[in-house]
């Protein structure tokens, strides 16, 4: 349900943060 979607977006957000850190 909605909780799973929240977790997916949280994981996506973390991945984006890691990618941004790696690019800099």
UniProtKB/Swiss-Prot annotation:
Pfam families: Antimicrobial19
Tissue note: Expressed by the skin glands.
Alphabetical keyword list: Amphibian defense peptide, Antibiotic, Antimicrobial, Fungicide, Immunity, Innate immunity, Secreted
Secreted keyword on record: yes
Any GO BP: defense response to fungus
Localisation per UniProt entry: Secreted
Domain of life: Eukaryota
Cellular-component GO terms for this entry: extracellular region
Task performed by this protein: Possesses antifungal activity against C.albicans and is also active against E.coli and S.aureus.
Protein family membership: Belongs to the frog skin active peptide (FSAP) family. Pseudin subfamily.
Protein name: Pseudin-1
């Amino acid at each position: 349900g909605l909780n799973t979607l929240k977790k997916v977006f949280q994981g996506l957000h973390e991945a984006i943060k890691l990618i941004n850190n790696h690019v800099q």
